[in-house]
Each structure stands twice: as C-alpha cells, then as structure tokens.
Amino acid sequence: MIYDVRQETIYNYDSPVAYAHHVLRLTPIDRAHQRVHAAALDITPTPIERREGQDFFGNRITWIAFDQPHDTLTVRVAARIAVEQAVAVEPGDTPPWEEVREAAFASADPSPQAPAHFLFPSRQVSLDPEIRDYVTLSFPPGRTILAGATDLMNRIKAEFVYEVGATTASTTPPMSFALRRGVCQDFTHIMISGMRSLGLPVAYVSGYLRTVRSRGETRLEGADAMHAWALVWCGPVVGWIGRASCRERV
C-alpha cells in the first residue's frame, strides 16, 4: 500500500521572535515493512541556516535557524511511503517476560536497535511506583511478553479516557496516570514507564494513523492523525513488536 502524507504544523508566538533555533524530526524513515519513496519539508519563513542529518537511532533530523523577527513558524511535510503488511506474531509465540528481562540485561549489543537503550528512565519518561504496581497486574509469573503487553494495552484502552486538551507536551507519566485521561502520547508514556520499571525494554514511536471510513463515506482531508505507540522488545528472536495503548476518536 502506498500512502501520500501531508502535515502542516504552525507555531504562533505571543510576540515576534528575533532569533530561533529548531531541531525537526518530521521526515519519515525507511524501516521494516516501510520504504520512503519521497519526502520534503517546506519551512516558512525561510531559515537563514538549514542542515540535514540523522541521530544515533537513524531518525532524520533537520536543524534550522532564524535571525529575523517572525511571529509565526509554519512547517509542511509531504511524503510518499510504501507500507507492507507485517506478519502477525501470536502472543503465545513469544517468550515469558522474565526470560525477556534476563536477555535484555545480558545483551552486549551496542547497535541502535539494542534493548539496552530502552531499559531506563529518560527526561520524558520517569519510573513511578504507582504505575509499576498497575502494570505488574498484566505480568503474572510465566506470562509471555506479548500477552502481557497486549493485556496492558487493553486495560489502558478500557480504563483511561482519550481527551484532547487534558494534558500538554510537558505532562509527565505520573500526572496523566493520576488523571486517567490524556492522548496517545500520554498512554504510551505510561506503558513505557511501567514496563521499564519491570526491566522490560520498550521504545516510543511516532507516526501517522490511517482511519478506516465506512462504506460510501467520503474521506475528509484531516480525518487521519499523528499517532504514538510503544515498541516492545520480545527477545532476540522475535525482536520489536508494536502495541498502541490509545483510544483514538478520529
């Protein structure tokens, strides 16, 4: 399946900004079952400096700088991406979560996809005892890693409320957990925080959600949305599997 993606991001400042530096991570990348045929960024106003590169994990980065007053910044993304349907992995075909934890801490793999990079707290995801206790209920002794992650995903979908505006980009996992509401970013952070508290590698992924319209319904531009989900490491044989703990209303 080939998708044409268009995204427009607009920043409005309270007062003109004379100097600004930004780091953009908006360009899709090639990965398993995904190939980028074309991608372009259009930035208004035109930056005085623009550099392209990639980070340690392979994400494409654009650095931009401005030296003239401006009160609005607009970034437009256009991309054509080919996506192949991945072969589904049954939860019962993955190892027990305790074995995955042992394998993660024993791994000496230094590559960007290694589990060691996704075991510990970060600036965005703290480890919280209340979240750990909540997540522990999904991981009784001997349950397979993907069965536990799927159970946790379904519990969050059932017990938390998807509400735009209830949180912000700076909301921490303990804050959204206490609220029991938020958006896909918040629910993904809760899932990551809790599973990492158990010693399980989980990564954060952002991308796009394609909605499915009813038969005869016209697809409206803007009906689809940016999305975030968790990648769960299921051991060295199975690798990384995605789980979305978000109740979307689009």
Identify the residue ranges that each predicted region occupies.
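A broad, low-specificity signal for short, low-complexity segments enriched in glycine/proline
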Residues: 1-4, 33-42, 163-165, 189-194, ...
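Short low-complexity stretches enriched in small and charged residues
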Residues: 28-37, 108-110, 157-160, 185-189, ...
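Long, hydrophobic, amphipathic alpha-helical segments used as structural scaffolds
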Residues: 85-88, 164, 195, 199-202
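Hydrophobic/aromatic-rich core segments of domains that either
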Residues: 150, 154, 186-247
